């Protein structure tokens, strides 16, 4: 069978299912695929294809995630679903699968459970901007009032974490019913996808954001100047654009990009995803180093102290075998370099166990170009022991 051509005419949006174990996230994922495929006369992704998720490595951490794709009339979706709770935590903290919005699955028979709360908190902390709710298993609840109560409880929980609980869409249905081809439940899946189409806005694409490139390597070309190489993380860099060199030193240097090279060819501009060399005017070989970033002026600043949501690897995952305490000093790996930092634990927390997910305050020994949602790994002697996402800049 020939490969289907990727349709670029429809806007592309990344979503994922979140929620408590056994509330039906994977069944819903399969149901969405089945119902949409049926409506378009295509083949669906089966439940066991999603459940037997392959393992991936992101920032030195192994995460099991299933990626499937489907489309509505308006959009093309990439959907991520994780088999285990720890996989969700790791996925969200490492940003392995960035979500433009999430579908929160809550069983009508249980209502919100501990992981429901944890996934909502994580969504808030790591910047999942929009949540649509699917109340699952409503075919197992006869009491209309009970359904109303559960919906109220979900909305209140979302509001507690600063999501617009009163206004966001809540669809009541049965994922299993839809998967089994029952028309009334299939209808609810279409209603859910309609809500996702309408409520989750199209994301700002990486090329539309402000230019930023982590510096991987630096070398000088006699008679031409200094070249910084790296992969453009976001935005566009045009020849003759002004740039700033940010991080590792208190003061930020300015320069002008006088040339952009890719695969030994000269370009007029580079955009997000390109691996390039940027020729910088008036910059000596010692003014710039790996670990800094090139950025559009006044868009990112160097910081030493921040709060972060982190996941600490369990012993089984190759992490630490013992807990750590306050004043723990590992290395924090940001983009292309390690910087030592000191950890402060939240008030009332004595120690952090391998396998924990917690908010830490970190003070680095050198400033790094940071902003909310910057991802990093935590390492000890080159071995990854955790991962995190910046939730707040302190100074």
Swiss-Prot record:
It is an enzyme of class 3 (hydrolase). Mg(2+) binds at residue 26. Residues 60-64 are annotated as: G2. PROSITE patterns: G_TR_1 (PS00301), G_TR_2 (PS51722). CDD domains: EF_Tu, EFTU_II, EFTU_III. It comes from the Bacteria. Residues 136-139 are annotated as: G4. Residues 19-26 are annotated as: G1. Residues 81-84 are annotated as: G3. It is found in: Cytoplasm. GTP binds at residues 19-26, 81-85, 136-139. Keywords: Cytoplasm, Elongation factor, GTP-binding, Hydrolase, Magnesium, Metal-binding, Nucleotide-binding, Protein biosynthesis. Belongs to the TRAFAC class translation factor GTPase superfamily. Classic translation factor GTPase family. EF-Tu/EF-1A subfamily. GTP hydrolase that promotes the GTP-dependent binding of aminoacyl-tRNA to the A-site of ribosomes during protein biosynthesis. NCBIfam families: EF-Tu, PRK00049.1, PRK12735.1, PRK12736.1, small_GTP. This is Elongation factor Tu.
């Amino acid at each position: 069978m020939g490969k289907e051509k990727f349709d670029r005419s429809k806007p592309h949006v990344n979503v994922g299912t979140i929620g408590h174990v056994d509330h039906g996230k994977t069944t819903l994922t399969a149901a969405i695929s089945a119902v949409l495929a049926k409506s378009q006369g295509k083949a669906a992704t089966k439940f066991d294809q999603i459940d037997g998720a392959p393992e991936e490595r992101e920032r030195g951490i192994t995460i099991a995630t299933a990626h499937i794709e489907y489309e509505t009339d308006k959009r093309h979706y990439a959907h991520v679903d994780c088999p285990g709770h720890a996989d969700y935590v790791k996925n969200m903290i490492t940003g392995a699968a960035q979500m433009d919005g999430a579908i929160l699955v809550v069983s009508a028979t249980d209502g919100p459970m501990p992981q429901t709360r944890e996934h909502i908190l994580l969504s808030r902390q790591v910047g999942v901007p929009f949540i649509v709710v699917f109340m699952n298993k409503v075919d197992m609840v006869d009491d209309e009032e009970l359904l109303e109560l559960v919906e109220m409880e979900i909305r209140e929980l979302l509001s507690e974490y600063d999501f617009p609980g009163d206004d966001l869409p809540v669809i009541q249905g049965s994922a299993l019913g839809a998967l089994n081809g029952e028309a009334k439940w299939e209808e609810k899946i279409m209603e859910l996808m309609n809500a996702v189409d309408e409520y989750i806005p199209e994301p700002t694409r990486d090329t539309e954001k402000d230019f930023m490139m982590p510096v991987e390597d630096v070398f000088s070309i006699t008679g031409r100047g200094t070249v910084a190489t790296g992969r453009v993380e976001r935005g566009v860099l045009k020849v003759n654009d002004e740039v700033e060199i940010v991080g590792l030193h208190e003061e930020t240097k300015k320069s002008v990009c006088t040339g952009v090279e890719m695969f030994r060819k000269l370009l007029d501009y580079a955009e997000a995803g390109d691996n390039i060399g940027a020729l910088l005017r008036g910059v000596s070989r010692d003014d710039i180093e790996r670990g800094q970033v090139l950025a559009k002026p006044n868009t990112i600043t160097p910081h030493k102290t921040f709060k972060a949501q982190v996941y600490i690897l369990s012993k089984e995952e190759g992490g630490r075998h013992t807990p750590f305490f306050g004043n723990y000093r590992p290395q924090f790996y940001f983009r292309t370099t390690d910087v030592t930092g000191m950890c402060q634990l939240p008030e009332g927390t004595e120690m952090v166990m391998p396998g924990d997910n917690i908010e830490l305050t970190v003070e680095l020994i050198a400033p790094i170009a940071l902003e909310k949602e910057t991802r990093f790994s935590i390492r000890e002697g080159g071995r990854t022991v955790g991962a995190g996402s910046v939730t707040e800049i302190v100074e």
